[in-house]
Amino acid sequence: MLPTAMRYSHTLLKEVVQPGHTAVDATMGNGFDTELLASLVGPTGQVFAFDIQEQALQVTKKRLAEKELLAQVQLIHQGHETLADVVSGPVHAAIFNLGYLPKGDKAIITLPDTTKTALEALLTRLAPKGRIILVCYYGHAGGEAELKEVHSFCQQLPQEEYNVLSYQFINQRNQPPILFCIERKNHQSSAR
């Protein structure tokens, strides 16, 4: 069977993240992506995980402690738009789950402007062959506007520098999530 957007996002991360790398979870949520990234970068790598909700930090901290992965993760109680102040680079992978915290306050959502700010900061830090993955949930109020912003942002990236993938199930009801993957091309191969 075809993988869900979430499962496919993890496949895309596993293909590029190596021990010792730096990765970003721009929307920590319940910590599943943070846990995966921490296991992939290993004790010599580093993960920066962002969320504005204290609940997300507590759940993620507990999850990471249980798996003995907390040492390589910085849990940051700030929005992903502050990424430029925290992460100096290079970043080998980043993931966003855009929408609201599952089982959380549905009035607290990610926003087009803050997501764009974070994406711009990540692009300046993205290592060659690095990936930024965005899983866009858009069935809530404000979700369509953010999806439109992400799609527009991705579509305008120069093909000489980036490959951009869109992955979605087009015959499913109830707005299934859409995945975007931005991959920086290898500088040497793009010069040919």
Regions found by a protein language model. Name each.
Residues 46-51:
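Conserved SAM-binding motif I beta-strand of class I
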Residues 1-21, 35, 39, 57-88, 92:
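S-adenosyl-L-methionine
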Residues 143-192:
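Class I S-adenosyl-L-methionine
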Residues 96-118:
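Mobile active-site "lid"/loop adjacent to the S-adenosyl-L-methionine
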Residues 18, 41-42, 126-128:
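Helix-to-beta-strand junctions that scaffold the AdoMet/dcAdoMet cofactor pocket
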Residues 125-136:
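Conserved beta-strand signature within the Rossmann-like core of class I S-adenosyl-L-methionine
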Residues 29-31:
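Conserved glycine-rich SAM-binding loop
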